[in-house]
Amino acid sequence: RGGGRGGPRGGGRGRGPGRGRGFNQESADDENAFGSNNGFSGRYRVQEDGESGKLSERRGGYGGPRGGFHGGRRGGFNNGDAAEGEGERPRRVFDRRSGTGRGNEYIKREGSGRGNWGTPADDIAQETEVPVNDGEKIVEAEKEAGQEEAEDTNKDSTAAEPEEKEPEEKEMTLEEYEKLMEEKRKALLALKPEERKVNLDKELESMQLLSNKKNDDEIFIKLGSEKEKRKEAVEKARKTQSINEFLKPAEGENYSRRGGRGRGPGRGRGGFGGGVGGNKSFSAPSIEDVGQFPSLVAK
């Protein structure tokens, strides 16, 4: 195999301890292995024409299993195909076959199924059926065209007949027209239902009609006004209650104004004299004072 692990793959001197035999370990007489092998790596040199065929059969081409045309990993151009240009991919010989070996090229299913082209018998059957179908279609098309022409002629003849018959204008005098109108009126009067007449009995004749002086509207208006008056009286009774009980302060409490922001040191509510529940106290207002409660004066 090629040189040792320490050296580069392909032709050249192996410098490290490697498995197998290096090229320079085998022949010490070769001064330049790259020149003597003409750039080809491996144990075998390029031999003469007679021996080159044997080497290509054994190794599969110019290169061995390791060390290709320019020191590649695997053999260069196998199957006897020479390189037209450097670096080109070799042509694959069996392109028609599946590379994986898992294809279904041998399963034909007698020409049917997916991926099959059918059988030659199918092509023959189609060729024989096509002209028959074409002939039948042509005959059917001619029949349909003849039927349409016959229908068109029938329609033209039927359309021409009513045009020839024009409606006759009826003429009448004024007297005849008035007679027709009178007959129509009489017929309408006969259709109208007769008015029903009430038969007055003796009891109905003895009765008298009494007119009610009070209309219904007036009654409803009076009822509404009475309800409103009652509501007003109840509201007045509630208002007349004294509110002294609500204005009296509880025991131990003094009314005071709420303090504003203090101006001294200590921001926030309640300064030097502005806290809630200050020293100043106010008495409850008296309801009897006319100046404070002018609306409670007896009218």
Swiss-Prot record:
Motif (Arginine-rich RNA-binding motif E-R-P-R-R-X-[F/Y]-[E/D]-R-R-S): 88-98
Pfam families linked to this entry: HABP4_PAI-RBP1
Stimuli inducing this protein: Stronger levels in light.
Gene3D superfamilies associated with the record: 6.10.140.1040
GO biological process, one term: response to light stimulus
Residue stretches of biased makeup (Basic and acidic residues): 45-60, 86-98, 134-146
Keywords: Cytoplasm, Nucleus, RNA-binding, Translation regulation
Protein name: RGG repeats nuclear RNA binding protein A
Naturally occurring in which organism (per UniProt): Nicotiana tabacum (Common tobacco)
Gene: RggA
